């Protein structure tokens, strides 16, 4: 037999298209020729494969070896094709039986000693192999994450010799156990935050509906603390969501088996580039928005971000996916993240503070806020002020109910005074959030923030008084059609938290109150 055909997987976004690895031996000058649009690391496989076979005591053929990776128009990258290429050469030379090869798919990078090294995207490849009904042989270091896929037949291979022994029937490869005992960490709790009842209420609404949220306030008022506690308010990921998020992390090479059931939380620095935020590169990799899939993306110091970087968020905030186009290829990554952002009210940060330390002129304040475009702000569902706390509130035991102290001129919140109610834990708020999300899922099969225009008409109906109030707000605040729909979705979430089937006037009024930037 001078021809052998095996199968492996490439990566294209989060998809893992099947690749046929065809090996042909012929006369001519000895050497290995790899065709089928291989990248540099794939072309280098000929040297790794030769050394690995020889060190594993196999004979490398003194003939011309042609390796074709099909389909030819799909780029192949990384060392994942080392193992199938080596097995194809061994099968074509009759050193291993070929009758079992069609049942399996193979992926793995070979060390020069014949040991197998981990590969990226094992979880995505295992999902695709299960869908096509094939068993998958992977390096032992990657098989654990692939075994998380329910009903997938995955084998953990430590070396080329072990794979050959398995195919010859002399020894069986191990079936790795999935990491099903992973539990969610509870490292932060909402009760850690003193006061800020209004901001906590907005955080609960955002968690219940999957809404985007913007905190604005002076430095040190707890904006970042509140954002960090949003994941603790969200219900646990179901298995499908966890696998989707884990597959993205696996493709990026950041998969951690112990935490695969946790909600992702990403907080990139404001100096991050557009490629770091949304993904890209010559070999497209997922960015921060995809690594936050089914989780939380926190952008601190929002006006300090490059405006061009922020503008790329507009598409994924609406669609939940990001399309990356390059001259040679196109990739698509999921990006159903929940955006939480924070900013100061002005360039110096002290506008509205009780100390009166702000000396920014109106023009300077306007220039600072204009760093964030109107279309991006229009896509943020809730905007809430996080005012400074008094020393009394900070020194008191954890308190959540507060009353606002306002100045006599503009009604700007300057500080908060503590009341007497105990602070709620994340678990208590999460229980209400879970119930509200269950109501939304039973009604429409998705969170309220993901409702499309036709679904808003069906599920966010208002009575006459509610329609009148929203119409007045639209006229007075110059709300766009998008803002109108987002206010409706927030009102639907508030009604779900209250346990109401219908949206009432108080729900609409509260939702309008969170359109703060529409009033500036």
Locations of regions flagged by a protein language model:
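Walker A/P-loop
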Residues: 215-257
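Residues immediately C-terminal
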Residues: 112, 297-298, 304-305, 391
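Peripheral, non-AAA+ core regions of ATP-driven protein-machinery
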Residues: 1-214, 218-221, 325, 484, ...
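The Walker A (P-loop) glycine that initiates the GxxxxGKT/S ATP-binding motif of P-loop NTPases
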Residues: 217, 279, 301
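Short beta-strand elements
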Residues: 19-25, 277, 381-384
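Walker B catalytic acidic pair
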Residues: 294, 300-301, 312
């Amino acid at each position: 037999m001078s021809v052998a055909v095996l199968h492996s997987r490439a990566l294209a976004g989060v998809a893992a298209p099947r690749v046929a690895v065809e090996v042909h031996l012929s006369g001519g000058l000895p050497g290995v020729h790899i065709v089928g649009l291989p990248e540099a690391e794939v072309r280098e496989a000929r040297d790794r494969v030769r050394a690995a076979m020889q060190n594993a005591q196999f004979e490398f053929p003194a003939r011309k070896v042609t390796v074709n990776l099909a389909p030819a128009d799909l780029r192949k990258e990384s060392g994942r094709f080392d193992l199938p290429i080596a097995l194809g050469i061994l099968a074509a030379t009759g050193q291993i039986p070929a009758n079992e090869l069609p049942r399996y798919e193979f992926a793995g990078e070979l060390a020069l000693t014949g040991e197998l090294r981990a590969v990226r995207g094992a979880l995505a490849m295992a999902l695709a192999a299960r869908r096509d009904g094939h068993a998958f042989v992977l390096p032992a270091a990657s098989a654990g994450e692939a075994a998380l896929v329910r009903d997938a037949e995955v084998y953990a291979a430590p070396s080329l010799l072990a794979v050959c022994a398995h195919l010859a029937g002399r020894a069986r490869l191990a079936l790795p156990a999935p990491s099903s005992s992973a539990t969610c960490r509870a490292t932060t709790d909402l009760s850690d935050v003193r006061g800020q009842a209004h901001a906590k209420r907005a955080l609960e609404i955002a968690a219940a509906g999957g809404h985007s949220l913007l905190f604005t306030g002076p430095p040190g008022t707890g904006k970042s603390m509140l954002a960090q506690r949003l994941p603790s308010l969200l219900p646990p990921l179901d298995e499908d969501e966890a696998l989707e998020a884990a597959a993205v992390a696996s493709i990026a090479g950041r998969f951690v088996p112990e935490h695969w059931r946790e909600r992702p939380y990403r907080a990139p620095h404001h100096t991050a580039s557009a490629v770091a935020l949304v993904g890209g590169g010559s070999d497209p990799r997922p960015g921060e928005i995809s690594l936050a899939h089914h989780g939380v993306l926190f952008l601190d110091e929002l006006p300090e971000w490059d405006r061009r970087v922020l503008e790329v968020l507009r598409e994924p905030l609406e669609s939940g996916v990001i399309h990356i186009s390059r001259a040679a290829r196109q990739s698509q990554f999921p990006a159903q993240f929940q955006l939480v952002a924070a900013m100061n009210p002005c360039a110096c940060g002290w506008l509205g503070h009780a100390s009166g330390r702000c000396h920014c002129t109106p023009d300077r304040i306007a220039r600072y806020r204009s760093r964030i475009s109107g279309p991006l702000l229009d896509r943020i569902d809730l905007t809430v002020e996080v005012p400074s706390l008094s020393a009394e509130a900070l020194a008191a035991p954890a308190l959540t109910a507060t009353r606002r102290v306002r100045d006599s001129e503009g009604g700007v919140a300057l500080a908060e005074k503590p009341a007497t109610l105990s602070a709620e834990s994340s678990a208590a708020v999460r229980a209400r959030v879970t119930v509200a999300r269950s109501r939304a899922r039973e009604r429409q099969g998705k969170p309220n923030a993901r409702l499309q225009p036709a679904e808003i008409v069906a599920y966010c109906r208002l009575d006459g008084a509610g329609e009148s109030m929203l119409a007045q707000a639209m006229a007075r605040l110059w709300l766009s059609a998008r803002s109108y729909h987002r206010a409706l979705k927030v009102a639907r979430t508030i009604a779900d938290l209250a346990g109401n089937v219908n949206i009432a006037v108080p729900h609409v009024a509260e939702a309008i109150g969170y359109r703060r930037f529409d009033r500036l």
